[in-house]
Amino acid sequence: MENYALAIANYFIELAHKDKIDIRPLKLMKLVYIAHGYILALLDKPTVGAKLEEVEAWQYGPVFPSVYYSFKQYGSQPIDKKTTVFDFSKIGSGEDCVYTPSLKCDEEKMVCEFVWRNYRNFNDSELVSKLHMNGTPWKECYKQGKNVVIPDKVTKRYYTLVAQNISKRINKQSQKDA
């Protein structure tokens, strides 16, 4: 089964390398979560959590454990390559057991590109601060010392409001320009 959190992470690494922008693990983890939120809100489908793993509220914000463990060896250094996954179900099948998770859905790629354009210039700590603000899913769910699950419905509700606010600002600006 495809790991969508890692597919999103790999897509952000691709975008970062294309734009010649360093991306470190902490920033990557935050961008993956933000993209997940917008995908839930805008595409109305659970791409990540429902398919393989759940988001957890860790000390420095929302985390998909697979993304953390796949990139933790970089520490605070820039990530230089995409991650790969070993698929145990393919052992003995004659198929390659190692693959690079990648997004297949164009709409999901578009959402990730939107997130990248709007958040790429924020550093790690700025993204952590944004995700720790009052009213965020992390703030609602975090319990110190526990990796509490952040339910998709909480994330979707929050990012639906964020998307609605963006839409209102765009409409207001369009009316001013008309």
Please place each PLM-identified region on the residue numbering.
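Domain-edge interaction signal
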Residues: 1-178
